[in-house]
Structures are given as structure tokens and as C-alpha cells.
Amino acid sequence: MRLSQFHLHTTKETPSDAELTSHRLMLRAGMIRKLASGLYTWSPLGLRVLRKVERIVREEMDRAGAVEFQIPTIQPKELWEQTGRWQKFGPQLLKIKDRKDQTFCYSPTAEEAACDFARSELSSYKQLPVNFYQIQTKFRDEIRPRFGVMRSREFLMKDAYSFHLHDECLVREYENMKSAYSRIFTRLGLDFRMVQADSGAIGGDASQEFHVIADSGEDALVFSTGSDYAANMEAAIAADPAPRAAASEAMRKVDTPTQKTCEDVAALLGINLQRTVKSVALIAGEGEAQQFVLVLVRGDHEVNEIKLAKVAGLDEQRFASEAEIAEHLGSVPGFLGPIAPAKAIRVVADREVAAMSDFVVGANEAGFHLAGVNWGRDLAEPEVADIRNVRAGDRALDGGELKIARGIEVGHVFQLGRTYARALDATVLDENGKAAVMAMGCYGIGISRVVAAAIEQNHDDAGIIWPDAMAPWQVVVCVINPKGDAAVADAATNLLQELRDAGLDAALDDRGLRPGAMFADMELIGIPHRVVVSERGLAAGTYEYRSRRASEAESLDKATLLQRLQG
């Protein structure tokens, strides 16, 4: 490839709306261009990187025994209604109508369509197990698309769907896909972690995420120092709290006229924030099933909405209004508590709160809190659940200490069980000739997201630092004055061919730019290895070589250069 014949358009300007480093560098490097909110055109340069990721993903999926197919991105409403996700998926599901007034959606994921394909193609247990995968565009109508392709509305995804007669077979394929994903991200040259996760809108019995480690990551990842335990914040669990200590104080009412937060109350009373209790008023359910719920967490903790939604009857909830708070508690926000409510209410306390004694909580009276409060003596024992986010320093289940890092989710694997297959009547005849609902797994990798995540992990002030496997070219041969010196141009062309013959993905920068501008472009677009061919170097029998990760260039003869690059 000669760059004089390639579209390479870099810019020095930093886009004002680019918040993340990856977004800024992808725009400056000319990898993507914005078409509309959350929609990006991939340039020839960006597409080379995208295709590198695709190739590795495809190779490892094939190696793992999966077979490629392709599902339409436009899918009929009826399929999604059968699984209940037409409404459940929410406004992220882009709904459209054709000229015949038939309703479709633009696929954000494809469990329904994959299951429909399987039920039409598979009739006997002898055809199982099977794992179908595709690399296809998806669309989610994000309310606030941002961060470039990290959270765009349209994105490229590898999604796979496996079908099984028995659960044991599903578990084996789940482990097979986890291994395949580990190989993929290792080959891509990324620092990644696999963590336990919540299944979210996809559903299922078990799921794990793959995260690229990056300080800018949106997700908090929790690790234990005592074992290989790892989970995202939604699913992370700390060890049980220590047993509750005996009460040592009498309950008393304290004046807190303007102190509405646990932090302010703790400061006023001169106590540790850990001795306070935060009360969150919610309305759960709808219609006749609607109930007022007071959720309690320690003052220095935060409610985990995913865990809370798993508590019986709390899968759907909202914050209570001030009128609803007044009706049920006879109080106002900032002074809420479980003692003496105006009406009977449901109280759900986090495990840490249930283990507290002599704590401080709202008095259900404006301007007052209660101190020295104890369970059993001052108020009834609560309903107890794990409903908080863990914190760095918490004790882990294995006895170690929990640590927190940041990550960017790039892959997710699920054991779906039979939820989708049962809803869509996807059955095969088993060994006894009886209809059996197939067990299902699904496995996704955000291919366009991987590109952005790799940049977040691999960059410096000058630009991108691609791992070799993802770079648009592994090596670029830079020619000094290609039009003015035929010998230099010929030597560069010959070197390019030798690099290709050695199995390296190489290009020739023969655009005729000044050396400084040419080198700046190579650093910006992240070329791992740069070789300079110049008149002075040829006279000395050397080439100037610089690794993108090195601070200085070095002069090497051709044999040493080739050995280094093949390395």
C-alpha cells in the first residue's frame, strides 16, 4: 500500500465536543466522521482497524466450532411481542413501519430472530449442539449518544447464539465461549478482565462480562486480593457484616434544623458517617399491587438499583413523591426514617444496616433525627437484603480485600436457559421422540467498541499506540524526498516488498511531506513500527527505526531491522 494512493486525512484541531481521548483521537486521525448524533462514517483508515478486529474474532469463533450466518437488522414486531421485549426493551428499541403499515424494529440484539431461525432449522436432538454467529450492525436509540463510537446509536457487533438439548451442554459451550473470548482479547493485545455480571435486559441464569482496563472506563470493576474473584459493581458482593453489637445507648431525639443529609447530620453530631442510616422512599408496583417501601442503607453507602430490583416485589419501582411521603410517613425529605410512620409501610434494610446498633436515622419529623436507635427495641426487625454497592476496602467472601478499578465493557456471555425458546416454541425431538424446549446461550462482542476501548488503554500525548494486531499497518516505511531521489525511492520500495514477503502488514509513506509532518501523522494514527529511508542512511547502509512505544529512534542494518520487526 502506497499512502499517496490512500485516503489519509488527519487534523491538528481537537474537536470541542469530544470528551473521551478515543473520540478525540479517532476524529483527529481521520478514522471516523460524524454523520448525525450517534452515527459515524468509518473512513478507509478506520475500516482497516475494524477489519483487523473482525478477522481475529471470526478466526477464534470458527476455531471454537461456531458457524457463521446472518440475520436481517430489520425484524418484525410479532417476534419481539412473543418474548415480551417489544415493551420491555423500552425507548432504545427503534420502531419503524413499512409502506404496508407493518411494524418492525431495527435490531439492538437478535435473540428472537436467532431463535426463530433455530426453530425452523432444527428438529432433532441429533442436530445439537450448534452455535450460530454473525458480525452485523445493531442500533440502539440511546437518549444521549456520546463518546464517539464508545456509545453510539449504530454499532458493529459479533453476536452468537447456541442451542442445546441439556443444560450441561449449555454450560460446556458457555465455558468454550469464555475461552474463545479470552483468546480474542489476548490476540488483540489488550489488558482485559472477565467479571461476574448481571444479565440485564437480555435475561438468563448466568452471565459474565469482558472489560478492557482503562482509567476512563464507565464501569467499576471489583476484584479480591484473596482469589481470582472479579465482578462488575452491579453484581459484586461483600462478605457478611460482623454480628450486631448490643445496644449501649438510649434512643433520643436530636435537633437537626437544616441538616438533611447523612453527611451534615454526622458533622453536626460529631460522629462517624458509618453510624448514620440513609432512608430512600420508593413506590413499587402498579395499581392495586402498589406499595410504599422505605429502603435503608448506611450513610456512607449507595443503593445498588440492580440488586434492589431482585428483591421480591421491587423489580419495578420509582421514587416516591413528596405527597406520597407525607401520606405514608407524615414527614418531608431529609428527615425520613422507619420509626412511627403515618401508615404501615414495607421496610427493606441492607445487611449492613440490619447489623447496626446505636445508629442515627430520620425522626419522620421536619428538623429532627433520632440517635441511639436499635433494632428490636425501638423498631421491628426489618426485611434484610444485600442492596448496596460494595466499596474499596470491604472484606471479600474469600477473606481478601475488595479493590476497585475502571473498565470498558467489550464482551458479554449469557446462559439464557429456555426463556426465549419457550416463548417462541423452539423445540426438537429428544432421544425418546418427545418435544423438548432447547436451552440457549448468547455471546456478544462490541467490535466497534473494542476499537475505542483499545485507544483508551493505548495512547499518549502524540496519539494512538496500537497493539500490532489492531494497527492499520504494522510497519510504515517513510521515504524522505521520494520524488527528488530515485535511489531512495527504489530502496524504500524494495524494503516494502521484503517486509511483505516476511509476512508483515506494511505500507509506504511516499506522500512527499516534510519529515516532521510525516512522523507526526504516523504517531497520531498509531503505527507500531516506523522505518525511515533516507539518502544519509543509505550511504551508511542503515535504516532509522523507531517503535511507537520507544522514546528514541535507532539506526539498524537491514538484517537486524528485519529480525527486529519479525521478532
UniProtKB/Swiss-Prot annotation:
SUPFAM superfamilies: Class II aaRS ABD-related (SSF52954), Class II aaRS and biotin synthetases (SSF55681), YbaK/ProRS associated domain (SSF55826)
Cellular localization per UniProt: Cytoplasm
Alphabetized PROSITE patterns for the sequence: AA_TRNA_LIGASE_II
Cellular component annotations (GO), alphabetically ordered: cytosol
Gene Ontology process terms (BP): prolyl-tRNA aminoacylation
Recorded catalytic activity of this chain's protein: tRNA(Pro) + L-proline + ATP = L-prolyl-tRNA(Pro) + AMP + diphosphate
GO MF, any single term: proline-tRNA ligase activity
Pfam family, one: tRNA_edit
PANTHER family, A to Z: MITOCHONDRIAL RIBOSOME PROTEIN L39/PROLYL-TRNA LIGASE FAMILY MEMBER, PROLINE--TRNA LIGASE
Function, as annotated: Catalyzes the attachment of proline to tRNA(Pro) in a two-step reaction: proline is first activated by ATP to form Pro-AMP and then transferred to the acceptor end of tRNA(Pro). As ProRS can inadvertently accommodate and process non-cognate amino acids such as alanine and cysteine, to avoid such errors it has two additional distinct editing activities against alanine. One activity is designated as 'pretransfer' editing and involves the tRNA(Pro)-independent hydrolysis of activated Ala-AMP.
Name of the protein in its database record: Proline--tRNA ligase
